[in-house]
């Protein structure tokens, strides 16, 4: 019988009753796979379970949930000493699963679990905001952030990622830009931004490719700004034919700094962070993550 590395699955409490997942884990255990399961109910649970994972000596901690769960587990993992840090696997169980989708993680529970347990680990970058808060996928600001944070849970549960678009169309009254200044290496822009995306990964908000050229192991952040010129016409052109829109500005840098004369909120993989000054930089190759061999986010 083949031997498999030991793993610990940290499961978001919203998915604790998933019968298909329960059956898949039972089948793995019947085939000799050692997989521990822990369920999160409140903030801080993931960090405690990773402490336990290190004590158990598991090779992989699997993030079972959406982008927020992946973010919480990745953040807790990079706080561990590199010598004892397990690799991270991904089991996409959230509403949008933006990072998992863009990374090519299988939608099938069985295939995703297999990849998370025995897939080859690649060293990936982690982004950090103001030397404190981290994200693995993307930081978004502006109209999209307000929509994502306010989309009702029942709508997300019923419709998944498309719920963000539907709720956005319902809340066009919120469509107002943020005035800010953005600096990076060989990059400077100042003006009114409708949407800002700073990507380590490529997509956010339920499938919107905000930073289509981003890679998670190239040491660079990708920036995309949707300016507010013409507002509604600009938004329509941007959504229907983004590569030809004059209202899009792109940039790349190892770091970006955003300064606003008023409070802004950025969504970091689902976690809101408010302020008037944000400095976003990269921690290169900070985490080993089990990804498909043909993962489009790897160079």
UniProtKB/Swiss-Prot annotation:
The family this protein is said to belong to: Belongs to the diacylglycerol/lipid kinase family. YegS lipid kinase subfamily.
Sequence ranges assigned to domain DAGKc in this UniProt record: 2-133
The entry's keywords: ATP-binding, Cytoplasm, Kinase, Lipid biosynthesis, Lipid metabolism, Magnesium, Metal-binding, Nucleotide-binding, Phospholipid biosynthesis, Phospholipid metabolism, Transferase
Catalytic residues (positions): 271 (proton acceptor)
Binding, Mg(2+): 215, 218, 220
Assigned EC number: 2.7.1.-
Cofactor: binding comment: Binds 1 Mg(2+) ion per subunit. Ca(2+) may be able to substitute.
Highest taxon, organism lineage: Bacteria
Subcellular location: Cytoplasm
Phylogenetic lineage: Bacteria, Pseudomonadati, Pseudomonadota, Gammaproteobacteria, Enterobacterales
One of the GO BP terms on file: phospholipid biosynthetic process
Cofactor: Mg(2+); Ca(2+)
Record keyword Lipid metabolism present: yes
Protein name, per record: Probable lipid kinase YegS-like
Binding positions for ATP per the UniProt entry: 40, 66-72, 95
Job description of the protein: Probably phosphorylates lipids; the in vivo substrate is unknown.
Gene Ontology cellular component terms for the protein in this record: cytoplasm; plasma membrane
Protein source organism: Enterobacter sp. (strain 638)
Cited PROSITE patterns: DAGK
Chief place where the protein resides: cytoplasm
